[in-house]
Amino acid sequence: MGSRNSSSAGSGSLEPSEGLSRRGTGLRRSEEEEEEDEDVDLAQVLAYLLRRGQVRLVQGRGAANLQLIQALSDSEEEHDSAWDGRLGDRYNPPVDATPDTRELEYNEIKTQVGLATGRLGLRRTALQQSFPQMLHQRERGLCHRGSFSLGEQSRVMSHFLPNDLSFTDTYSQKAFCGIYSKDGQIFMSACQDQTIRLYDCRYGRFHKFKSIKARDVGWSVLDVAFTPDGNHFLYSSWSDYIHICNIYGEGDTHTALDLRPDERRFAVFSIAVSSDGREVLGGANDGCLYVFDREQNRRTLQIESHEDDVNAVAFADISSQILFSGGDDAICKVWDRRTMREDDPKPVGALAGHQDGITFIDSKGDARYLISNSKDQTIKLWDIRRFSSREGMEASRLAATQQNWDYRWQQVPKIAWKKLKLPGDSSLMTYRGHGVLHTLIRCRFSPAHSTGQQFIYSGCSTGKVVVYDLLSGHIVKKLTNHKACVRDVSWHPFEEKIVSSSWDGNLRLWQYRQAEYFQDDMPESDMNRVCSSGPTPVPCPSVAFSSPQ
């Protein structure tokens, strides 16, 4: 998982013919070469131990004093003296100026987004219309039935992406998770201080109304989820249990769901809840998927799913029959809940193309498209109708095992900056321009109601929120204010608001604010002509939209 080192034990292997000294007609190893091979063997052993997370290197007092100590965990989530996430501030992720969109040209997702944003069939000049021009057309009765369609509403809102910091809450330790409920009325935040905070988001507010002390927490809460009815939430940590707790009411009732793992040190890095609230899905550091049935109150499945930590799980749609998993083996797997068996753990397909471990997966909600974030510093868009070949899976596995750096505390190697496409890569699109360091950074599709899911947004190790255009692959917005990596991001399902959760201990709410000048919206050539002190921002003008169902 994000915790495990990426180094490879086999990266320093030698060909059988290397190191042989040819003397006369025979082949013998010289003493010097034997000693050299001995050193190589030790290096291989050290690389293996580092990759498995059983030991780690720490900086001593001297500039060149490196110490080898036994690791307390084999995950990214370590003790409080671990790296605080600020190294990534010095890393400037390279932006892909010319994303490869060829695979999207004839894929159905282009039509879907075009319909959802009112762009399908429009000429280039119409696509470039400003918001006032769209209003003018509506007033002239040129819109459908005299008002904006749902697609046109989404296109209007693309002019008002969040760009201004409107609220900050500060914690004493790192913020790990932060998500909106399905109806957008509650925001839930989980911090390393073992406290889960709930915020009331109704009527434009963002007011904390409850703080709950999590139980049985090892180092930090790692993931959270709401139940479909919105009355309870779940959280996971370094523990054998996933806990469920009530949101409303005076007291806090914590129920422990025992997964009964085989590992002594066990963590659930990712959780998801089925649409009927009955089953809880978890991905763990033992390479297994766990399914817990709340009605039977027992674990019903333990599936050996990945060769390394399972960092991400997600249901494909509201049917909860198709699910996704991703791990440190760089493979995303697709499972059918109806055919999952412990004695025959076979996925229905796999998606390969990443070159390092997967940190997060988000489904578009249509049981077809998903995105995955990875330690190879990319997001990939997938179509489950395009599974990868055996060649693609082997290429991804090999690339992942050959990584020889630790993303928790080392800088990104320059080779990761190159636009390399592995053989058999079946992804539709690759997005570059954000950093994935230190922790399992999340990425998500933008909401369907307000944006038509035309954007992908992600946290970043440099303390930013990065928003990509799904179809073009270009960055359309960067929100910058944090001093450490942004681990989680969440977009309000019906409003233009984004909340970022960072390792600098801050929770930040971003909204659109209109002003005469905004540097992010201005060409760099015009920057110098803008005064440093601009006019006071004013709220976005209200636009009539249909209410959410």
Curated annotation (Swiss-Prot):
Low complexity compositional bias, start-end: 1-24
Entry keyword set: Phosphoprotein, Repeat, Ubl conjugation pathway, WD repeat
Pathway(s) this gene product operates in, as recorded in its UniProt entry: Protein modification; protein ubiquitination
SUPFAM superfamilies in alphabetical order: WD40 repeat-like (SSF50978)
Superkingdom assignment: Eukaryota
GO biological process entries: cognition; exploration behavior; gene expression; memory; protein stabilization; protein ubiquitination; respiratory system process; response to oxidative stress
Keyword Phosphoprotein: yes
InterPro entries according to UniProt: DCAF (IPR051859), DCAF11/LEC14B (IPR017399), G-protein_beta_WD-40_rep (IPR020472), WD40/YVTN_repeat-like_dom_sf (IPR015943), WD40_repeat_dom_sf (IPR036322), WD40_rpt (IPR001680)
Phosphoserine: residues bearing it: 73, 75
GO CC annotation: Cul4-RING E3 ubiquitin ligase complex; nucleoplasm
The protein's role, per its UniProt record: May function as a substrate receptor for CUL4-DDB1 E3 ubiquitin-protein ligase complex.
PANTHER family referenced in this protein's UniProt entry, alphabetically: DDB1- AND CUL4-ASSOCIATED FACTOR 11 (PTHR19847:SF7)
Designated name of the protein: DDB1- and CUL4-associated factor 11
Biological classification of the source: Eukaryota, Metazoa, Chordata, Craniata, Vertebrata
